[in-house]
Each structure stands twice: as C-alpha cells, then as structure tokens.
C-alpha cells in the first residue's frame, strides 16, 4: 500500500516537471478583464486562450458553475439609483444649530427632570431665568423633600407655596434618612423626655409638702444638682440639633401634604433686583458694587449729594479727632493730618 502511494506521488511529480518545463509560461493579465481590456495592446505571442487552457487542463472539459467571485464577465442587472448630493459641512452645522436653538426656545424643559410640558404644567417659581427657569410642581416638591429647603439654591428666593390639605394618614410616606439624621432624632426625643421628667420631679419635690424630708436630705440635694446639670445639657442638645430635626420635619411635611406652587410675580417681589431675575447672587452683588446702574435713575442733584456726604463725614470725623488732641500734639502732627485728609478725599 505504501509503495503504491509512493509510486503515484513520483509519477505525478514527474508529470508536473515535464509539463511545466515544456510549455511557455503565460503572461499575467490585468484584473479588469481579458488581454487588452485595460487599454494596452497584448504582447506578441500571448494568447487569450492560455488561461482557458489551464482551466480546462485543471478542471476538465465538463462545464462547471461559476461563482460570484469567479465570473469572468459582469452580470447585467439594474443599476442602483444615484445617491442624492450631500450639502457642505458648514450647512449641516448651521442647520443643526438652528434646529437646536428653535427647539430650546419653543419647548422649555424642567430643570429637575429635563422633560417638557408633556409631563405636566411648567411653572416659574423663582427669579431664575433662562434654561433653569421652569420646573414641574411634582418635581419641585420632590426636590424640596430631598433637600429640606424651601428656597431656590441659585437665586435664594423663597418659593411661594400654599398648603391645601394634609394627606390621609394611611397615605403618608416615609422619607429616606441617613444614620446621622436617625441619631439626631433619637437624641432630640430622649433629651426631651428626660428634660420633662426631671423638671416635673424637681418642681414636685421643691413645692410639695409631702417632700419636705427630701429637701432636707443631703443625698437628695446632690441629686438636685445632678438633675439640674443634666437639664442644662439636654437644653443645649435640643438647641444644637433642633434645626436639623426641623429640616427633617419640613422634608416629611413636603411629601405628606398637598401643595400649590405659585408662579414668580415680579410686582410682589420687594427684595428682588430691578433687572428681574438672573440666577445666583449676581443681582444683589451688582446692586451693591455697581452704583452706576442705579445712578442712572436718580436726578443729578441727589447723585451729587450722595457723593459729597462720605467726604464731609470724613472731614467731620478728622476735625473732631483733631480737637480732642492736646495743643502741642495738634501742632506737631498738622502735616500728618493734612496727608490723611487728602488720602480720604481721594
């Protein structure tokens, strides 16, 4: 068996050597098609049948099915429709920018949930303007219940809300509390109970006729001092943790009560700035540090009087200080006082 396979292999090797050396080698053709298909004239002695002869020698003379990759001639079929011309990149950027601006101007969004009016009515509860102006009432109530503050964190305006009614006790919801908040609530409750009990006992033992023997005993007098000290400690603890517990109570109240949030009314805002509400502290800071913005609405006489008053006050104060000094010190420091007055005037 092995010998027969070796003989067959040697015979095939001899045949391959003889056929490869006796026939001229075909020139390579371009991939685009047959000889001369790319625009170049075929070489002399080069036949287009060489490739077909090789295929016939390798595959045989029987017809075979050609694959997609082996088709010599392109198949005729419907051409795809031409693609529409693309606009230049600058036009695409301008189109996207204009669409985003139009969508931002036409559809305001809630600054908490980033949803539009389809999720509910949008309110404007504070002085904030721009993209942080609107919010949904349920989103605002939920934010207040999480934060515990009824003022805007940007413009510090206190929300105008109306308490409609308290929910049914069966519908009350618990709020999320941290470990520190639970400890604060426990400290307030225990301190209040101890304070009430100790003060009640002290009042009874000091006023009741039946406790006359207790007031005369030394041990009870020591207890009076200890209870008095613990009462002071409990009062300090309640004062220290009272604000935190009150904030927790306001959070719970925001969840378990029905509210109606009112829109910001500029005419009723006494402490608001004249500009009408930019977010943050820019309004009060500008009103304090920018006198030119408010001076445009004042008459010139009032503006001049306002600028002269600080200078006259400075002169008056320096004059009084100079009169209080002794005569020798006043004469020796006359030049120094002149310098101070000039600096104040500048």
Swiss-Prot record:
Enzyme Commission number(s) from the entry: 2.3.2.27
Q: Which keywords does this chain's UniProt record carry?
A: Golgi apparatus, Lysosome, Membrane, Metal-binding, Transferase, Transmembrane, Transmembrane helix, Ubl conjugation pathway, Zinc, Zinc-finger
The biological pathway it contributes to is: Protein modification; protein ubiquitination
Q: Which PROSITE patterns match?
A: ZF_RING_CH
Q: Does the keyword rRNA processing apply?
A: no
- Which SUPFAM superfamilies has this protein been placed in? RING/U-box
- Chain residue ranges for the region called Disordered: 20-39, 47-92, 273-301, 326-346
Q: Where is the composition biased (Polar residues)?
A: 284-296
Q: Where in the cell is it found?
A: Golgi apparatus membrane; Lysosome membrane
Which GO MF terms does the UniProt record name?
ubiquitin-protein transferase activity; zinc ion binding
Q: Name one GO biological process term.
A: protein ubiquitination
**Which amino acid positions bind Zn(2+) 1, per UniProt?**
110, 113, 136, 139
User: Which parts of the sequence are RING-CH-type zinc fingers?
Assistant: 102-162
Keyword Secreted carried by entry: no
Look up and give the membrane topology term.
Answer: Multi-pass membrane protein
Instruction: Tell me which Gene3D superfamilies the record gives.
Output: Zinc/RING finger domain, C3HC4 (zinc finger) (3.30.40.10)
Residue ranges crossing the lipid bilayer per the database entry: 185-205, 219-239
Compositional bias segments (type: Basic and acidic residues): 63-75
One Pfam family this sequence matches:
RINGv
- According to its UniProt record, this protein's enzyme class is transferase
What reactions does this protein catalyze? S-ubiquitinyl-[E2 ubiquitin-conjugating enzyme]-L-cysteine + [acceptor protein]-L-lysine = [E2 ubiquitin-conjugating enzyme]-L-cysteine + N(6)-ubiquitinyl-[acceptor protein]-L-lysine
Q: In which tissues is it expressed?
A: Ubiquitously expressed.
Q: How does it assemble?
A: Homodimer.
Write out the function statement from the record. E3 ubiquitin-protein ligase that may mediate ubiquitination of MHC-I, CD4 and ICAM1, and promote their subsequent endocytosis and sorting to lysosomes via multivesicular bodies. E3 ubiquitin ligases accept ubiquitin from an E2 ubiquitin-conjugating enzyme in the form of a thioester and then directly transfer the ubiquitin to targeted substrates.
Notes on the domains: The RING-CH-type zinc finger domain is required for E3 ligase activity.
Q: What is the name of this protein?
A: E3 ubiquitin-protein ligase MARCHF9
- Biological source species: Homo sapiens (Human)
Which gene name belongs to this protein?
MARCHF9
